[in-house]
């Protein structure tokens, strides 16, 4: 049997027929990605994302001779966290259950990466370009999202979240094996939260640059250049805001969410020494029943003081999660035990406390449990495998994935 490669991108493939085909693709992959949503609701939300011209996305998919869609991958470009860098997120990886164990998605991923990096269309075995494949539009789209100066600099990285362990290592992706997800289920929430205005502050999207730059609070920076997408964090502000807004649009979160979703973090100062500060950022995860704390900064030296800070952060995070989840359609089908707050020790930034000490403090705070690598493994691949040693993610990679 032979298989044909197709592509659709939301910059040039916007005809009525293109949109109709895109809906079929979303319906096909919905069994793996819709969660509690009805297929039609999943289609509607994803089509909003596809039809949002301010964002960029491209799908490649294989069809069998009988017209079945058998494998799918989506490539989403994101501004890198270093200036002048780009992150290509490999997502929506899907194989039709009737066509599994044939290596089809592996062939598709290899072809897509090679096509992006070299422009060639070499094929593996029984795969060919579909007769309707619009190569000129496809190349024009890639040129649009990959400016020539970035391509020449090779400051491009592929990233993904794997739910199949290190499977993607065969494509050159390096796992962030030191990621340990520490989780708190909603049935263990303490939502008795009231802001202590003398020592605490809710952080908002409007002034996130002020909080994120460490100079104001003398908080540490990560400066190891090998840790891609980690240093020079002040470069993340436009990308963070863009990704956050994308999440709101994707999930149809309107007025009710904005009241609570305007907050992006929590600042707490020492009660006796105001110079001792901890900042925790918070954001919805791409699984709608999960909330992630994607970065924690502290200059606190004493573990007991930090434990107090974390207890307050936990109460804030539980309050935030409850408010946000109450506004998301279809979450009523989830039990509290399936609603989760997440943080990783690799997202902890401190010059005085170790990541192990951070993990120990968290897991000694009511209800938090270390789940190890958990449900997702962040992975990264250098453009053309050009770096020696290869880049690695110094944190959970979440900033790259939203």
Go through each PLM region and give its residues.
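Active-site rim helix/loop that mediates acceptor-substrate recognition in acyltransferases
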Residues: 28-81, 224-273
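Amide-forming acyltransferase catalytic core, primarily the GNAT-like/NAT-type
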Residues: 174-295
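Conserved GNAT-family N-acetyltransferase fold
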Residues: 60, 71-73, 88, 93, ...
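Conserved acetyl-CoA-binding loop-helix of GNAT-fold acetyltransferases
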Residues: 92-118, 122-127, 138-140, 304-324
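Active-site/acyl-donor-binding loops of N-acyltransferases
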Residues: 137-152, 161, 165-197, 286-288, ...
């Amino acid at each position: 049997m032979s298989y044909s490669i197709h592509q659709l991108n939301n910059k040039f493939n916007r005809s009525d027929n293109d949109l109709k085909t895109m809906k079929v693709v979303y319906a096909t992959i919905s069994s793996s990605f819709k969660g509690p949503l009805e297929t039609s609701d999943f289609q509607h939300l994803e089509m909003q994302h596809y039809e949002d011209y301010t964002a960029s996305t491209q799908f490649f998919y294989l069809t069998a001779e009988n017209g079945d869609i058998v494998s799918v991958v989506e490539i989403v470009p994101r501004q890198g966290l270093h200036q002048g860098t780009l992150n290509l997120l490999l997502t929506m990886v899907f194989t039709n259950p009737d066509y599994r164990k044939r290596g089809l998605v592996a062939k598709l991923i290899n072809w897509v990466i090679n096509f992006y990096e070299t422009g060639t269309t070499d094929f593996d075995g029984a795969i060919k370009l579909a007769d309707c494949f619009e190569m000129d539009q496809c190349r024009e789209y890639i040129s649009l999202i990959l400016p020539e100066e970035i391509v020449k600099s090779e400051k491009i990285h592929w990233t993904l979240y794997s739910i199949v362990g290190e499977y993607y290592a065969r494509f050159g992706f390096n796992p962030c094996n030191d990621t340990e997800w520490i989780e708190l289920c909603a049935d263990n929430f303490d939502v008795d939260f009231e802001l202590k205005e003398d020592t605490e502050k809710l952080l908002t999207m409007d002034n996130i640059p002020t909080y994120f730059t460490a100079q104001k609070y003398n908080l540490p920076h990560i400066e190891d250049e090998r840790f891609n997408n980690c240093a020079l964090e002040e470069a993340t502000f436009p990308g963070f805001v863009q990704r956050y807004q994308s999440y709101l649009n994707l999930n149809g979160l309107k007025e009710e969410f904005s009241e609570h979703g305007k907050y992006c973090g929590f600042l707490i100062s020492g009660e006796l020494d105001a110079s001792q500060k901890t900042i925790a950022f918070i954001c919805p995860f791409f699984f709608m029943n999960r909330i992630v704390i994607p970065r924690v900064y502290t200059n606190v030296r004493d573990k007991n003081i930090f434990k107090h800070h974390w207890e307050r952060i936990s109460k804030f995070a539980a309050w935030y999660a409850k408010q946000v989840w109450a506004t998301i359609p279809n979450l009523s089908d989830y039990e509290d035990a399936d609603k989760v707050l997440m943080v990783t020790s690799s997202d902890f930034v401190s010059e005085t406390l170790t990541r192990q000490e951070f993990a120990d403090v968290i897991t000694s705070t009511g209800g938090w449990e270390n789940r190890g690598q958990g449900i997702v493994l962040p992975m990264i691949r250098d453009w053309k495998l050009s770096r020696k040693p290869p880049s690695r993610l110094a944190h959970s990679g979440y900033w790259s994935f939203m």
